[in-house]
Amino acid sequence: MVYIAVAGGSGMVGQEIIDALVAKGKHQIVLLSRKDAPKETLPDGVKWTKTTYDVAHLVEVLRGVDTVLSFVAGPADPTNKAREDTQKNLIDAAIQAGVRRFAPSEWASAGFDHMFWYNYKSDIRNYLIEVNKDKKVLEYTLFQPGIFTNYLTYPFKSAKRIQQLGLPFNYHERHAVIVDGHEDAKITLTTVQDLARIVAVAVEHEEEWPRVSGMNGGNLTIRQVIELGEKVRGGPFTVEKLKAEDVKAGVLKTSRVSKATHPSIPEEEREAAAPVLMAGILMGFSSGVFEVSDEWNRLLPDYKFTQPEDFLTKAWAEIDAGATEVSIEV
C-alpha cells in the first residue's frame, strides 16, 4: 500500500490516473482540491480534502503521505502565476511533511519551446533543482508520454476521461496542417491508458525514480503520422504546408484552425486562443519537443506498450462501423 496525495485530480489526465490507482485496490489516496467534496460517494480508499494550498495546511494534510502527484492546471496565460505558486507550496509542504516522492504537473512534452502556456512547468523544474541543490530533500520525476495517441480519434472518445482535443492532424477529416520542411521531426505517441498504468506501477517502484520518466508507445515522424492516418482511414489526406516564419509570427495561412477546447480555456476566450495555440503546437511539433525518452520502457521491459498503429487501426475500424465512442481495450 502506498499513501498518495493527488493535487488537481479533477482534470482529465488526473482522473485517468486516479482510476488506475483505485483499480489496484490497495492504495490510500487523498484528493486535494479548492472545491467542496462531490456529492457522489468516493471509491474505497479515497478521501477528499478541501484546501487553499496554504503551506501550513498542506503540511498537516501531507503528513504520512509517501507520494504526491500534481495535475495542477489553469488559464493559458503566461502572466498568471497561480499554477506555479500552488506547486511551489506543494513542494515546500511536501519537504516539511517528510513526503518521499513528488511528480510535478508535466504529463506531456520533453521541452516547451514555442508553447508559452507551459512556462510554469519549466519554472517548477527549476524550482525542484533549486530545493535539491545542496542535498536531496525530495525525490521527483517528470512523467512525459508525448502526445496521447487517443487524440487521433478526434472527435470520437477513445478513453474514459480524456476529452478529445483537436490537433493539426485530423484523421476524421483526412486533413493535416504542418510546417513545411519539418516532415521528419519526430513525435512520441502514447495512449493515456498506458500512461495511467505506468504511473500506477511507478508509485510502487522500490528503486529511486529516474529524474525524467519518459514512456514511449511509438516514435513517428510527422510524415509517418500522416501516412498512418491514410492507412487506417483508407484514403489520401489533404496536407497544408505552412511557412515556419509565418507560423512563428502567428499567421496561419490555412483553411482550418484546430478548435481550442481544453477545459482550462474559458469558452469566451477559445476563438481568440485557437490560432495562438495551434501556432505554438505546430512549432512545438516541428522542433521535436514532443519526442520523449523511454525510461519506463527500459525499466519495465515486459510491459507491452500499445503501438499507435494497433490502437488506431482498431479504433477507426469501430468508428467506421458506426461507433460514436471507441470501446477499445488496451
Map each language-model feature to its residues.
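Oxidoreductase cofactor-interface core, primarily capturing Rossmann-like NAD(P)-dependent enzymes
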Residues: V2-L42, V55, A97, A110-P236
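NAD(P)H-binding glycine-rich loop region in Rossmannoid oxidoreductase-like domains
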Residues: L31, D36-A97, S109-G111
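Amphipathic terminal alpha-helices
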Residues: S293-V330
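Short, glycine-/small-residue-enriched flexible loop/hinge segments at domain edges that mediate gating
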Residues: F102-A110
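A conserved mid-domain beta-alpha-beta active-site/ligand-binding segment of alpha/beta enzyme cores
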Residues: A185-A196, A273-S286, P301
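Structural motif
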Residues: Y3, D66-T67, R101
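Terminal hydrophobic/aromatic helix or amphipathic segment near a protein terminus
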Residues: S213, I226-V289
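Short, amphipathic alpha-helical "lid/cap" segments that border enzyme active or binding sites
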Residues: I91, V192-A200, F305-T313
